Structure formats: structure tokens, C-alpha cells
Amino acid sequence: MLKTGKKFHYTAPANGYPEWNNNPEIFQLNRSKAHALLMPYQTVEEALKNDRKSSVYYQSLNGSWYFHFAENADGRVKNFFAPEFSYEKWDSISVPSHWQLQGYDYPQYTNVTYPWVENEELEPPFAPTKYNPVGQYVRTFTPKSEWKDQPVYISFQGVESAFYVWINGEFVGYSEDSFTPAEFDITSYLQEGENTIAVEVYRWSDASWLEDQDFWRMSGIFRDVYLYSTPQVHIYDFSVRSSLDNNYEDGELSVSADILNYFEHDTQDLTFEVMLYDANAQEVLQAPLQTNLSVSDQRTVSLRTHIKSPAKWSAESPNLYTLVLSLKNAAGSIIETESCKVGFRTFEIKNGLMTINGKRIVLRGVNRHEFDSVKGRAGITREDMIHDILLMKQHNINAVRTSHYPNDSVWYELCNEYGLYVIDETNLETHGTWTYLQEGEQKAVPGSKPEWKENVLDRCRSMYERDKNHPSIIIWSLGNESFGGENFQHMYTFFKEKDSTRLVHYEGIFHHRDYDASDIESTMYVKPADVERYALMNPKKPYILCEYSHAMGNSCGNLYKYWELFDQYPILQGGFIWDWKDQALQATAEDGTSYLAYGGDFGDTPNDGNFCGNGLIFADGTASPKIAEVKKCYQPVKWTAVDPAKGKFAVQNKHLFTNLNAYDFVWTVEKNGELVEKHASLLNVAPDGTDELTLSYPLYEQENETDEFVLTLSLRLSKDTAWASAGYEVAYEQFVLPAKAAMPSVKAAHPALTVDQNEQTLTVTGTNFTAIFDKRKGQFISYNYERTELLASGFRPNFWRAVTDNDLGNKLHERCQTWRQASLEQHVKKVTVQPQVDFVIISVELALDNSLASCYVTYTLYNDGEMKIEQSLAPSETMPEIPEIGMLFTMNAAFDSLTWYGRGPHENYWDRKTGAKLALHKGSVKEQVTPYLRPQECGNKTDVRWATITNDQGRGFLIKGLPTVELNALPYSPFELEAYDHFYKLPASDSVTVRVNYKQMGVGGDDSWQAKTHPNYTLYANRSYTNTFTLKPL
């Protein structure tokens, strides 16, 4: 039955435990049957607007509630729900919220380990009892007068993790599953005028064994709470199917609705009708679909029709219609209306591949937790969600996995509207109950344990029923990292029996093959070579990486390798980066400084530190440099050079449904970063098609032997869209063009150098500069140009970077410690000075602390002040890989202006530079610091031809690579960065640390706990290296 209409009669569990402890079979009491997200309206016009909160049938209970906190069940107020209980002196708390962020209890971040393990040793299904906080909420409300004699329900959109509800002192019900709605029929509990609601929430319950997601462990009423009423006869639920025919041309619309006669009064001659409206609110059907009916208690009705050539829905073109369902009385007057958005699309496996509307789909995806740095998961607003979606769309992301629980319903509506494919994931993760490589199910939950079967099926049902009508959802996921077992087969069967329009996904079968509960082969953090190996095995299932490119700290190296594979092998159909946003909470240090906190910062144990910092965007919602790489790798267009000298290039359109002529095509040529010419036109390349592009430009001539001409091809929005304005660049590619070589340049004549030296120092003087070299240190200790001192400390070989999170994960800081010591401890073995008329050569042989490598530095100082530095390193092949090879020096903090011609404008690395443009870039040194959660290597620039570091007067150094260098200029040294666990703890800097490198090893990113940087981006010790560049004073 859909209703009770009567008060619930409570019976205590037979085992003597409360519902929330040691009772996995009890996951709800008196909860209403799950249904699609709906809200009754009084008119068609209201239904078309579909503004639920403006409906006369809606009443919010968000706001201030009275609140009592207890550390465990024994400390709670036992009779707080009684009508005579006085709660007026209790604290107040805002709903929705996490009580941990409102001054009670503490937030706790842990990944795999269950949060209570250090307080209590437990086995499932027992819940903690020693420390298991309980939040008790009370408030009053007066139902709207218009609701008299109508059914009334209360809807909790999200409560973590288990809760009881009382109305006016009477027990209404109980529910678990933190991330799907729990609704209760409270009609029979209400009284005239003011009513009192009491809610008791448990931080942990036996259901918490199913909610071991990698996130902050927080609790409370964290999503909207509201009342809603309905007419006595109303549409309780409805299901919409809007697929395409076999030719993907015409649409098939079918609607099924459950009609409920709540009070079972006689009803005759009702009419149920359906009308479809287009994006302009114009009727699509010539006449409404309708059927006449009478309803004594409840009834299901179905209607269907054929739609000629509807506008199709896809992430590229998210064309939506509005379906309005109306229930009318015998006189033809509206009793109520409901509505939802409809998108005509067909998602299926065809010829072994996942397809959307007949075309092979590639999921350019990301995993997303619901998170806000101030609110946690609580009260995430529509504006918060739109902010995320705009950034996703702007960076060519077309798919999102709701890791690892159903999101707020508004999220799916926005994905429908803006165009994102969704993997909707069941609220299930039990990572802490099993270990990798275990052979059997052992202690894995839910496994094949019968006591958990109905619990997990209820989670599937709650998600499915709420979300079934969203066109953006293409895949149901059974959960995350919960091993395998028969219960997953039951879950799989549930979805397959309910829904033929979507696929079912579960990565866990990779670890336990006894139950094949997935339509898709899915893995996590598999290296590109292993992904390719699957493609070569003649596989039967399409493949995705449901998690890959672990974006912890400075990461996402070699992302392009995966996308080369997705292009090469049709069976490989994309992946979802882990993850979208750093989960860091705003906190205040003892001195009042605001900072972003991670695990352990609240005294929480156990914790997993900054492992919550895996985002493509920072916790404050701003973009990190990593997402620029994602945008480039995910871009829907590919250009390749055919014959650049003749202006010939190949164009591949990766869109499935969009011709490239929908965009503006702009191409430019720049000389050393300065614009030479710019042209705009259109590219006419069919969806999923290729063509040849011919551009007309001359053979450019160099004026200087270092001149460089760069062609940039750019695809830009031709008009405003919902997610970006006209002119926004969607895709680009760059090519260095061939040019007619210039004659070698000859240095201008300058007066001869003056060289003075003694045992300790060497002083070189030119027309407007003086440089002092310390022979004992083997360094220049001063470089004075035009009465401005440019050096704070001299040039020294450096082989170390501030360890990244990936470095820590693969133990580089232990394995390669010798190179850290070699950077800090260097001894001069020999200094040779060779004065000439126009230059002086100073050769330094250094003994490094590790004694297994030979290091030489040669300085050639010319009479115009320019200095050429040649660094060579000959390591022993028995030594570990080298984090970086270069020279480090410092300047005064006043030299804060940085200009470079190389890749940028954001930081980039040997294995993460695809999305960084070769151009002329400018910024302050301070701006080069990337605020990762834990201070680490950041700010690097690759393929740098030249750079200047100057003060306000324009004094400083011009650095030129021979031919290129990597450059890093920050207010901190690598050793300072890695000495602190938060950026706010770093002391104010009085210098600029400049590192001019031959190379720095790549940042990696296959995972952040074991994977090393790929070999082709690693500086191995089995060869010699040379780093050459020049510095010239400005």
C-alpha cells in the first residue's frame, strides 16, 4: 500500500537492541514508499515553472531548531519529545547543518578506516556505544490553513546517519540511509494550530558500516526538511520513459502514474492527462494524452505516444521538454498538476560499445563529493551546484559520478539542464571491512550475508525511485569499494528488472568475480599500459576507469596517455578523475588566522591527514592548475600537423552531434609571444568526422636566431551559452612553424673586463656591473648592476624539490634522500679561473654530500654583464632517480615581477604541460604559489625560452635557456615549503628563490600511494646531464 492513514504501532526489536544497533534488517519504521521527486501544483502554469518551494503545498522547516547534544545514547534526554517537556533553554542550531560545524562534537576525516576504531573494537553490525553522539532537535510549526482536511507528509532530504521522529509526543517513525529522502505520513498526528516535532539523530548506527566513504565524517540534518500536502486524490508517483526509435529519429513517450485516494472517499469520473511542452512552453501534442478513471484507494495508469523528430538530449545539446501531468475532476477542473523535465535519448550497449543516440560515447568524467569548505555537505545550494557545473562545462567535462551516494535532487535537474552524463551511485561503501587481494568474502559487508540484503536493496530502491525520471542519469552504480558477493547480484537484478533504459555499474567485481553484477568493466587507478592490455584481450564489455588520475596535491601527470588510448581503442570509453574538489574545512588557528583544515586538525583520530585534498578545484571553489590539463585532454577537437610549411593540418571533430561550424575558428601567429597576424573563419567538420584544413601564411623570416613563430588554432563559442559567454575558448592546439633562419648574431663591443682576485674572492668589473665570486663557496656572492644588488645568495646546484603528495606516497622522500643532502651539502674541490679580454671563465668542481656523483659548474661572464652557466652532473647508476637538476639562487623579495616566454600562465610540469600555452606570460612571484592543502612543490614553468625577474624599477635578471629551461620563482625554497604542514604556518618571506632547471621530474598521478612518476618523465642516474642557460642584468 502507498499509505497508512493510521498511526504507527511501535514494537521494539526482538533482540533487545535499539533499531540503530545490531539490527541491519531494521532500516526504517513507518517510512513512506519511495517515489519520484514531486510537488503538487494548482495550475498548469505553476507546473511549467516547477518551482517546488513556491507551491502552496510546500512548507519549509529549515531554520532554527532547539538542540541538545550528548556524547552517547546514555547521555541523551530520554523524554525530550513529550508534550510537557520544556526545551526552551536548549541551545539553538541551524537546519540544515552538521552539528560538528556548529560548535558540537568534532569533524573527522578518514578514508578507509572506520572512525570509531580507536574508541571501540566492533564487528558489524554493532554500532559504537561509548562515544556515539546523539543530537536531539525540537521545533514547532503550524501547517498552512489551506491544508485542512488534506494529507500532510514530512520529508527529510538527508539525515546522517539514523534518526527517530515524533510529532506532538507520538512516535512517527525511524529511518537510515543518510543520502536519500525519508518521508513520513503525519496526517493523523497533527493537531489544530501549533504542532511540535522532535527528531533524534545518531552520529553512527549499524548502517554506518555501509557508509564508509572517503569523506569528512559528520552528522545531523544536513539537507532540507519540509512539509508538503496533497489533494485527497493525487498523483503519488510517476515514471517517464522518453527513448528514441531504432533509427534514433522519432521519440517514444510513455508515462505511468500511481493515483492515490488517500481517504478512500468515492471518486468517479476523474481524468488523468499528460501534455508535453517544448523549451518555449508551447504544446507539442495536438491534444493531451488522457484517460478516465475512478479510484477507490489506489490505481496505476499508463499512457504512451509517438513524438515525431523531437529535439534530442545529450550532454552536447541538452534539449529538454516539460511534461505536465494533471488530475481533473468530473467538471474538468484541475485537482492537481505535477511536472518534470523530459529528454529524448537512448543509452545502450550496441555492438559491444556504450552508445548515446546511436553514437559511441566517451565519458570525460570526474568524481564529485557534495562539499563546501564552510558548510561541509550541509545546505549545498543551487548556486553552489551551478558554480560546479559551470566550471565542469567550461573545462570540457561531460560526465560526473555522484561519489559515493545519491546527491541532492537539484543536482540532477541541473545536469539535465546544462548537459552532464551522470553515474548515480548507491549509498554504499564498506571499504574498511575488506582488504585488497583477499580471496573470499570473509568479513566483507554486505557480501552474501542475508541480514544485509534488504538493507542494500532498500538503498537501491530509494535512489532509483527518486531519480528514475532524469535523462542525465545513464548508469546506476551499486556503490563503491565494497568487494563483492551475492547481495550485489540482487542489487544488479533489481535495477535490470526496473529499468531497461540504463546500464548498471559496479567496480567491485574486479576484486570478486563470482558475481558478475556489472554491465561495464570498471577499474580504479590502473596504469595506462594495463588499460591498453584490457583493450587487446578481445574483451566482451565496454571499459571505463571509474576513478583515475588521483588529483592529490600537485598531480595529474601523464593524463594525456589515457586519452590517447581512449582515442585508439573504441572499447575504452573514458574515465572519472578522482576527484572534483578539495575536501578541506575552514578553521581558525590560535592566532586568529583562517586556514583550510584537513584530517587531524580538529584532534580527530583516526584520520588520514590531507588525503582529502584530491580536487581539480580548491576547497574555496577556485580552479587549480590541474584542471587546465583536464580541459586540454578532454577537448572535443584534435588538430594534427600534415605539412605546416604549406599550412596543412588535419582536424578531427570528436563531438557526436555538433558540427564545428557551430563555433568560431580563430587562428593566430605570434612571434616570440607577440601577435603577428590573426584570422577568424568557420570550420565545417561534421560530428565525429575528420577533414583537412589549409591555412595561408608566408614562410616567416627570423630577424634573430632565437626568433620563433607559433601558430595557435582556437575553437571558440560563437554565441552565449548557459555555461559560458561568446568568445570562450573550448579547444586549441599550437604548432611551432618553420622559418627562414637568421644569420648568427654577434655580440656588441664593450670595454674589457677588469678582474681582481685573491685567495678568497674574485671580483669582475664591467662598465656598469660588478660581480664577486667566493672561491671557497664556489659561488657568486654578489652581482651589482647599476648600483642595484641583484643577488641575495649565489648560484648552487640543486637536485631537490619540496616533496609532493605523490612523492610521499611512493616514498621518494626516503628513496631519494641522498639528493636532498647533495643539495644542502656541497664542498668545493677545485676552482679554475681563466681571464680573457672580453670574458672570464670560472670552472668549479664540487664534491656532493653523497660522493657518488660528479658535479661541475662553469661560469662564463662576458664584458656586457651576461653570464653563461653550464652545469653538468655525472651520477653513479647505482643511485636513485633525481628529483630535479638545476641551479638555485635567491634575490631580494623586491624582485617580485615575473615575465616569461614559455608555457603558462599556470604552473606546468614535464608530464603535465599539454594544457599550458606557449606564450608570453606575466605575474608576480607571489602569484606563482599554488595553495595546495599541504605546502609542496608548485609554480614550475616548462619550455621556457626566456624570463625576466625584476623589481619596480625594472632592474633584475633576464634568463635565457639554451635552448630552453624549466623555471621556478617562488617566495620560498623547496626546503622551506616542505618544512610546514599548512601554508599559513610559513613565515613571511624576504627573498625570491629562483630555480633554473634542466628538468624537474614529472609529478605523476596514476595514484598517490604507490605509483612512481612514469619512466619517460624520470631523471634516472644512469646517464650524465647538462644544464645550460644565460643570465643578463637588466
From Swiss-Prot:
Source organism per UniProt: Priestia megaterium (strain DSM 319 / IMG 1521)
Keywords tagged on the record: Glycosidase, Hydrolase
MF GO annotations: beta-galactosidase activity; carbohydrate binding
Any single GO CC term annotated in Swiss-Prot or TrEMBL for this entry: beta-galactosidase complex
Homology family: Belongs to the glycosyl hydrolase 2 family.
Gene Ontology biological process terms in this record: lactose catabolic process
Record's catalysed reaction(s): Hydrolysis of terminal non-reducing beta-D-galactose residues in beta-D-galactosides
Active site (catalytic residues): 481 (proton donor), 547 (nucleophile)
One Pfam family, short name: LacZ_4
Name of the protein in its database record: Beta-galactosidase
Annotated Gene3D superfamilies: 2.70.98.10, Galactose-binding domain-like (2.60.120.260), Glycosidases (3.20.20.80), Immunoglobulins (2.60.40.10)
EC number from the UniProt entry: 3.2.1.23
The UniProt record lists the keyword Hydrolase: yes
Species classification: Bacteria, Bacillati, Bacillota, Bacilli, Bacillales
PROSITE patterns associated with the record: GLYCOSYL_HYDROL_F2_1, GLYCOSYL_HYDROL_F2_2
